[in-house]
């Protein structure tokens, strides 16, 4: 999650990079600041770590973000209990939040 990390990834021709732990290292503001010099190369990011329903729209609205991930989509207790319907509902809610920003 540093410019040096991005440079190393580019050496390997990687253009999609994990941005972790997103919120702990400065969130979307930090991501957008480090992304600027690489935009012309088509580098995109997948923020993880601290992404939540409350900041999902901000992240997904950024042109630097390809996708997001978060443990809130499949909390451990729901996985352990096999509550796939609840996990599906959380995923559907996330999709609806994001769709609302693109329509």
Q: What do these predicted regions represent?
A:
Residues 1, 22, 46-53, 71-73:
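Active-site beta-loop-alpha junctions enriched in small/polar residues
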Residues 3-12, 35-36, 51-66:
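Catalytic cores of alpha/beta
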Residues 77-103:
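C-terminal helical cap(s) of enzyme catalytic domains, especially alpha/beta-barrels
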Residues 6, 28-31, 56, 88-95:
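Generic structural signal for well-ordered alpha-helices
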Residues 6, 18-27, 63-86:
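Glycine-rich phosphate-binding active-site loops on the catalytic face of alpha/beta enzymes
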Residues 38-47:
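Short beta-strand/loop segments at the ligand-binding rim of alpha/beta enzyme cores
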Residues 25, 32-37:
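A charged, well-structured terminal subsegment
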């Amino acid at each position: 999650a540093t410019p040096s990390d991005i440079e190393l990834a580019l050496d390997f021709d990687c253009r999609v990079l994990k941005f972790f732990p997103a919120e702990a290292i400065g969130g979307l503001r930090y991501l957008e600041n480090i992304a600027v010099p690489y935009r012309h190369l088509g580098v995109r990011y997948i923020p993880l770590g601290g992404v939540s329903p409350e900041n999902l729209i901000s992240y997904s609205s950024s042109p630097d973000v390809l996708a997001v991930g978060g443990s809130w989509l499949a909390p451990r207790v729901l996985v352990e209990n096999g509550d796939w319907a609840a996990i599906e509902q959380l995923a559907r809610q996330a999709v609806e939040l994001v769709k609302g920003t693109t329509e």
